[in-house]
């Protein structure tokens, strides 16, 4: 593969084929391409607009080069991030609820644009985020939950970390996280930072052997189910791609004030989650339940979103014990108790 020819093709706004993109991504991730050319390629892709084939090719490369574990029938609740609003880590909270009834392989990272990434909030709760593969399988067996820290499970990505940081712009790598779960989770609730990317990412997901994925973008511009209004969805399954629009009031609840969901730090997010689990923060609890409801539908545990919401109400009642179990087997209960004390006021 001639990297300069690939660059010229991208500059001329021609899309790469899947095999070309996969080969290119492997070369970049392995550190075989000079940084100046990596920068040029990532910018050219962004300016052209990443195609479905390019996303699929890059995702396949990242999956192949990742440290892998086998978690049958797992669900993930990862999102692209990048919405910039800094809301509570609802996908992580939902993952904890889902682990009451299904294996969860939560793939995530530290915050990039927000105040708290999934790794940050789990650490604040006392969780040990570095989990080797054998230990990960053990934790899933015992608790139905494991966190797969992206930096640990995609070690080759360190070869592009400097370029990405220097560029300081969104690149194709920013949208690959939810598509590259090291456990190859077959079910997913995938938050998308932009409504415009729903179509592209749903078509990409369709090519990547998921059983069922629900991609969501919610008003007022978040990569979650909307707490205030409409959620735009793409439901991807073996049968194809279905487009759905759903309003928060369709759950049978009122809209949730967005300002009640904003956090300033990982600890702040952890406290809000625990308060919701304890029944002390109704707004955050509702936000968790509506996102969990859609994830339950992705798992085919319920027949519609409203039924999912009713199921989520039951799950959140059992969330504190589940959180204690998760931290006790892989973390620091002292840190969790500190958060519990701060949450009890």
Curated annotation (Swiss-Prot):
Q: Which GO terms describe its biological process?
A: L-tryptophan biosynthetic process
Binding residues annotated for 5-phospho-alpha-D-ribose 1-diphosphate, in chain numbering: 79, 82-83, 87, 89-92, 106-114, 118
Which reaction is catalysed here?
Answer: N-(5-phospho-beta-D-ribosyl)anthranilate + diphosphate = 5-phospho-alpha-D-ribose 1-diphosphate + anthranilate
One Pfam family, please name it: Glycos_trans_3N
Q: Where does Mg(2+) 2 bind?
A: 223-224
> Belongs to which family?
Belongs to the anthranilate phosphoribosyltransferase family.
Quaternary structure and partners? Homodimer.
The protein's name: Anthranilate phosphoribosyltransferase
In the UniProt record, what gene is named as encoding this protein?
A: trpD
